[in-house]
């Protein structure tokens, strides 16, 4: 009888302990969940250059997202000004202060693996954007790291198609020396950069595949900068003058600088007899304005909702969901990247209708 009482007592105590522990665990879980829901998600965007037209565009979009999601998310923005040491110091400081999501436009793409490794030690998810490594293997080892990027090959192809359409429809205006060869200047964003390489390669190969002979006059590396492009194209115009028949730029920032330089000499101001087709990539507001006025031929338009896509994917990473859950996008063949397609945008430079 005494043994039975002991067994019953021990059993009762065990049950009570289990119930208490379970209740405490449930309370802790509820507290943690509510805590996460009450706190706004802290997002830090680290940019190579916040004055870049595309980054200005993205920053405005993210600020709109914050306004429309008050209390849910807070964005902070850090400008490395092309300085790797500054960016590394900013990241280190923010990791120690506490952060929930990092959007990374890295200064030195060769430093990406080391930077991601450091960030993931804090269990902070990362979205890499605007610049990408030559191989996805740098990203693959990390569960909470994703690349959100565009298809640079497609962007180059669209540029080539726009130039081809212009040449085929208005060759008499473009082929100034009547040699049946398209003389062009290629404005390069960065040397040894995969995005620059693909955009340059596929724009020209598309033109050549259409049966158009080409000759490159110059291919300066301009670091994606408007003012550098303006001064460089100014100098190239003085050197080549009427030989320049098209300018193909790796992005809109440099294309804008090219248009500004040409306008100094009376080109691309609306006079149909003095036109040099200029194409860019991204679809930033200033480029769209130049295109709509007929001062720039066109651009490969980045999806204007890309900030929303990055936000949705980022929130999925923060809350341990499938990164593309609730979006219309899917991971590419690497399993660690989402590709946002470009669309062609042209204006009335040669009386085109805006597409």
Label every model-predicted segment.
Residues 117-154, 179-180, 284-290:
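Flexible loop/hinge segments that line or gate small-molecule binding clefts
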Residues 22-39, 180-191, 303-355:
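Hinge/cleft segment of the Venus flytrap/periplasmic-binding protein
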Residues 1-41, 117, 121-122, 353-354:
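Short, low-complexity disordered leader/linker segments with a strong preference
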Residues 54-68, 155-159, 194-213, 232, ...:
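Short, solvent-exposed amphipathic alpha-helices that sit
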Residues 74-100, 218-240:
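Structural motif
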Residues 147-180, 229, 283-287, 303-321:
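Hydrophobic alpha-helical segments within soluble ligand-binding/sensing domains
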Residues 104-121, 126, 203, 217-288:
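Hydrophobic alpha-helical
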Residues 35-61, 65, 69, 76-91, ...:
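Extracytoplasmic "Venus flytrap"
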């Amino acid at each position: 009888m005494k043994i039975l009482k002991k067994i019953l007592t021990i059993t009762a105590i065990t049950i009570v302990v289990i119930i208490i522990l379970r209740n405490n665990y449930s309370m802790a879980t509820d507290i943690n969940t509510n805590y996460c829901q009450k706190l706004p998600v802290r997002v830090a965007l680290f940019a190579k250059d916040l004055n870049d037209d595309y980054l200005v565009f993205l920053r405005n979009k993210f600020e709109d997202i914050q306004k429309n999601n008050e209390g849910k998310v807070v964005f902070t923005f850090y400008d490395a000004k092309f300085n790797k040491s500054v960016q590394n110091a900013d990241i280190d400081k923010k990791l120690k202060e506490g952060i929930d999501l990092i959007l990374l436009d890295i200064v030195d793409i060769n430093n990406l693996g080391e930077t991601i490794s450091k960030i993931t030690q804090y269990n902070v998810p990362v979205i890499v954007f605007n610049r990408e490594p030559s191989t996805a293997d740098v990203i693959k080892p990390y569960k909470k790291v994703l690349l959100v990027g565009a298809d640079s090959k497609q962007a180059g192809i669209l540029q080539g198609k726009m130039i081809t359409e212009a040449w085929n429809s208005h060759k008499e205006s473009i082929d100034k020396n009547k040699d049946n060869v398209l003389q062009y200047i290629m404005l390069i964003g960065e040397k040894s950069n995969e995005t620059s390489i693909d955009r340059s390669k596929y724009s020209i190969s598309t033109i050549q595949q259409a049966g158009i002979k080409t000759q490159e006059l110059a291919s300066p590396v301009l670091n994606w900068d408007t003012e550098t492009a303006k001064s460089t194209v100014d100098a190239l115009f003085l050197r080549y003058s009427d030989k320049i028949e098209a300018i193909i730029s790796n992005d809109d920032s440099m294309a804008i600088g090219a248009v500004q330089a040409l306008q100094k000499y009376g080109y691309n101001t609306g006079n149909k007899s003095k036109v040099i087709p200029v194409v860019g990539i991204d679809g930033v507001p200033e480029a769209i304005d130049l295109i709509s006025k007929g001062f720039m031929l066109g651009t490969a338009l980045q999806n204007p909702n890309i900030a929303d896509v990055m936000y949705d994917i980022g929130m999925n990473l923060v809350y341990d969901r499938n990164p593309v859950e609730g979006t219309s996008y899917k991971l590419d063949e690497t399993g660690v990247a989402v590709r946002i397609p470009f669309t062609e945008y042209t204006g009335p430079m040669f009386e085109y209708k805006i597409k």
